[in-house]
Regions:
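Intrinsically disordered or low-complexity boundary/linker segments at protein termini
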Residues: 1-17, 129-171
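Small/aliphatic-rich secondary-structure junction motif
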Residues: 2-53, 165-171
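Short amphipathic alpha-helical segments
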Residues: 19-20, 123-125
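Hydrophobic/aromatic ligand-binding patch that stacks against planar heteroaromatic rings
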Residues: 25-27, 101, 131
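Short, structurally constrained coil/turn elements
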Residues: 29, 79-81, 133
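Glycine-rich, flexible loop segments associated with nucleotide phosphate handling
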Residues: 35, 125-126
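General small-molecule cofactor/ligand-binding pocket signal
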Residues: 36-38, 86-90, 137-145
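Charged, low-complexity cytosolic intrinsically disordered regulatory segments
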Residues: 43-110, 115-121, 128-129, 149-171
Length: 171
């Protein structure tokens, strides 16, 4: 049976540092990993909007090319230990809903950033970190330095920097 790891995301390459850390921490295990990247967004209360609600369409709007490319790179680099990597939206309103989400997805551990504030994409988005910190799931806080980007060349380098370790390319 695969271990399931829950990781909050804001659909930036930077937020994938949590996934990279989780994968590195579990790289010596023979157990396969299920990675769930989750984003907090409330659903509308409009009957019309709920009738035509599509999680796929919402994710399509939230994801960008750099994020998709970085996810593919993570999958390729850690294919030997990743059983499945998915992106989901949590739209619950309280801690009980979050605990039910964890139980329903059989989440065994979670990773959150210590010194990085997730960026909310729209007015319906909300910060999931308080739900994580109050949960009963084993929680790992990841500390990393963020770098401000000044131009698009730096943004491209940010993707490749996910896979550099101490000045050398990680294999």
């Amino acid at each position: 049976m695969a271990k399931t790891i829950l990781i909050p995301t804001d659909f930036t390459v930077e937020s994938l540092n949590l996934a990279k850390t989780a994968l590195e921490n579990n790289s010596n295990t023979t157990e396969k990993l299920r990675i769930i990247l989750v984003y907090g967004q409330w659903t509308s209360s409009s009957i019309t909007e709920l009738l035509f609600y599509s999680k796929g369409q919402i994710l399509e709007v939230l994801e960008n090319e750099e994020f998709k490319c970085s996810c593919k790179m993570l999958l390729a680099k850690y294919e030997s230990i990743i059983d499945q990597m998915s992106i989901d939206i949590f739209s619950g309103t309280n801690q009980n809903a979050f605990e039910n989400y964890l139980e329903g997805n059989k989440v065994t551990e979670a990773y959150i950033p210590r010194n990085y504030k997730l960026k909310l994409k729209n007015r319906n988005s909300f910060n999931l970190i308080p739900f994580f910190t109050k949960s009963k799931t084993q929680l790992f806080e990841v500390n990393w330095n963020t770098v401000s980007l000044e131009n698009s060349e730096n943004q491209k380098n940010e993707i490749s920097s996910l896979f550099f370790t101490h000045g050398q390319i990680a294999h």
